[in-house]
Amino acid sequence: MKLSEIYPEVLGGGDDGHSTAFTEVNEEDGSIRLKADRPAILVSSTSWTPDEDFGILFEALSRYESHCEIMPLPNLVCVITGRGPRKEYYRELITDQHWQHIQVIMPWLEPQDYPLMLGSADLGVCLHTSSSGVDLPMKVRIWMN
C-alpha cells in the first residue's frame, strides 16, 4: 500500500489524480515536476530507544514551527520510521503540539522502500548516539556499501 493512501491528509494530492503534495504534471510536456510551494521532507529512522534521543529532534521541530511564524520557511513533512518502546510516547507528544507548519508521520517502511524514501528527502537526521563517539550508525554503514 502506498504511503499516500495511508496518510492522505499529509501525502495525498489533488482530486485530479495528476498531482501529489509534492509534485504535479507539467501540462506542456507531461513531465513530472516539483511544486513550487511543496513542503520539505525530513526523514529520520529510529529504534525509539534512549540511545536515539528523539527529544533533540522534537525540540528542533518546535523551534522550526516558531520560526515559521516570523519568516518564510517551507512547511515540513517529517517521516520518522522505526519501531520501539518510546514510539507511542512521542506520538502522543507530537499530537499534543498542534503544529501548523509541521506534519509528522511514523510509518514502518519495508526494506525496499527505505532507499526510495531517503532519495526523496530534503534532509536526513540521524539520532544515534555513539557510545565510542567514533562509529557510524549501522543503517548508514549498510547503505554506504
Could you say what each language-model-derived stretch is?
Residues S47-D53, S62-E65, E69, R83-R86, ...:
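Nucleotide-sugar-dependent glycosyltransferase donor-binding/catalytic pocket residues
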